[in-house]
């Protein structure tokens, strides 16, 4: 007789800001709820733009979530009866999140994560490249460029209406007042302050 294994998997939803990542995460998790599956959602404490204890899309759709400070906080929860685990804004967690989502999948959970693939400079946003590599399914969403209306794959950070400098901090949580979607042609990263002084 053959043995059957109940194995979980990882689904990764990624793209620029305003591409609908949280919206898609909420949609997939709600389908699990409709199917009478036990669903638990986590979000990083740093993301308090709309609500501390809910995943909220830019369109206002929301789902209850557990606010956590570190990726290890996920393992402190009793997940023994949980079928589906959602994690929003995964790029804000430490690199240990990669091992944690793999462990959750190995324990039979369906893990659905969402987060940015690139930072405001257009560079890979760690640990998303590793999450994408270990995922069984990767969905890359695009927004619409705020300048020309074409497909947008990048996130433009604006400080007082001007492009952020290359040496600005990577993590700065904001919404539409400090970020907008841009295509490759209209994505701008200003030179560092020291480069400007040399000119």
From Swiss-Prot:
<dbReference type="GO" id="GO:0005829">
    <property type="term" value="C:cytosol"/>
</dbReference>
<keyword id="KW-0547">Nucleotide-binding</keyword>
<feature type="binding site">
    <location>
        <position position="148"/>
    </location>
    <ligand>
        <name>Zn(2+)</name>
    </ligand>
</feature>
<dbReference type="GO" id="GO:0005524">
    <property type="term" value="F:ATP binding"/>
</dbReference>
<keyword id="KW-0808">Transferase</keyword>
<dbReference type="GO" id="GO:0046104">
    <property type="term" value="P:thymidine metabolic process"/>
</dbReference>
<dbReference type="GO" id="GO:0004797">
    <property type="term" value="F:thymidine kinase activity"/>
</dbReference>
<dbReference type="InterPro" id="IPR001267">
    <property type="entry name" value="Thymidine_kinase"/>
</dbReference>
<dbReference type="GO" id="GO:0008270">
    <property type="term" value="F:zinc ion binding"/>
</dbReference>
<feature type="binding site">
    <location>
        <begin position="15"/>
        <end position="22"/>
    </location>
    <ligand>
        <name>ATP</name>
    </ligand>
</feature>
<keyword id="KW-0862">Zinc</keyword>
<keyword id="KW-0067">ATP-binding</keyword>
<feature type="binding site">
    <location>
        <position position="145"/>
    </location>
    <ligand>
        <name>Zn(2+)</name>
    </ligand>
</feature>
<dbReference type="InterPro" id="IPR020633">
    <property type="entry name" value="Thymidine_kinase_CS"/>
</dbReference>
<keyword id="KW-0418">Kinase</keyword>
<feature type="binding site">
    <location>
        <position position="183"/>
    </location>
    <ligand>
        <name>Zn(2+)</name>
    </ligand>
</feature>
<comment type="similarity">
    <text>Belongs to the thymidine kinase family.</text>
</comment>
<feature type="binding site">
    <location>
        <begin position="88"/>
        <end position="91"/>
    </location>
    <ligand>
        <name>ATP</name>
    </ligand>
</feature>
<feature type="active site" description="Proton acceptor">
    <location>
        <position position="89"/>
    </location>
</feature>
<protein>
    <recommendedName>
        <fullName>Thymidine kinase</fullName>
        <ecNumber>2.7.1.21</ecNumber>
    </recommendedName>
</protein>
<dbReference type="InterPro" id="IPR027417">
    <property type="entry name" value="P-loop_NTPase"/>
</dbReference>
<comment type="subunit">
    <text>Homotetramer.</text>
</comment>
<keyword id="KW-0479">Metal-binding</keyword>
<dbReference type="Pfam" id="PF00265">
    <property type="entry name" value="TK"/>
</dbReference>
<keyword id="KW-0237">DNA synthesis</keyword>
<dbReference type="GO" id="GO:0071897">
    <property type="term" value="P:DNA biosynthetic process"/>
</dbReference>
<feature type="binding site">
    <location>
        <position position="186"/>
    </location>
    <ligand>
        <name>Zn(2+)</name>
    </ligand>
</feature>
<keyword id="KW-0963">Cytoplasm</keyword>
